[in-house]
Amino acid sequence: MKLSKRGEYALRALIDLGIASELGWPMLQASELATKEKLPIKFLEQIFTQLKAAGYVKSRRGKFGGYSLGRPMNQIKFGAVIRLIDGPLAPIRCVSQMAYVRCSCPDEVHCGLRMLMLDVRNAIAKLLDRYTLADIVEITLRKLRRDKVTPPFLSRSTKLRSVLPPVLNRLGDGGRKFNSVGPTSGKRRK
């Protein structure tokens, strides 16, 4: 599996929409996201078309329009989004669950390479299917607060100090139980 630029930008856009939603900005314009992510707006709009067709985002036209999340963040799994944008997670097609193609190996059942790649595919799928957009937004918000950084698309009129503390208070632990890769057992990472 290799994450394409299209897949990377789709995930980053969803994270931005999730952060904006948590911070009280339910709609973001494509131009704001394109500026933040430094990519052509037409490319981002193509990505949003795919995400919208699958129900991950919704849009509203007009001066105050833009894009927002189409589902609750805890229902958006990273594995599903990557499969939508980039296709199967499998490193070789003979281990794919979405696009299986028999390989050239004469004995597929006993092929060592296939067994290894099946383990790789399963590990990737398990990890990506475990994380939801809510998980990543929560981790990101905690890091932003810790580092006192304002998301670029919120700098237009919102200050970090007034917005992030109430959000983190709703999270319950003030950001202490998450490290850079996910939940910890109450220990802080050094």
Regions inferred by a protein language model and the residue ranges of each:
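Alpha-helical residues within the helix-turn-helix
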Residues: 35, 52-53
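A short alpha-helical element within helix-turn-helix/winged-helix DNA-binding domains
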Residues: 27-38
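Beta-hairpin "wing" of winged helix-turn-helix
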Residues: 55-70
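Short amphipathic alpha-helical interface segments
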Residues: 10-24
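Non-DNA-binding regulatory cores of transcription-related proteins
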Residues: 72-172, 177-182, 189-190
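Short, hydrophobic-biased segments on the C-terminal half of alpha helices
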Residues: 48-49
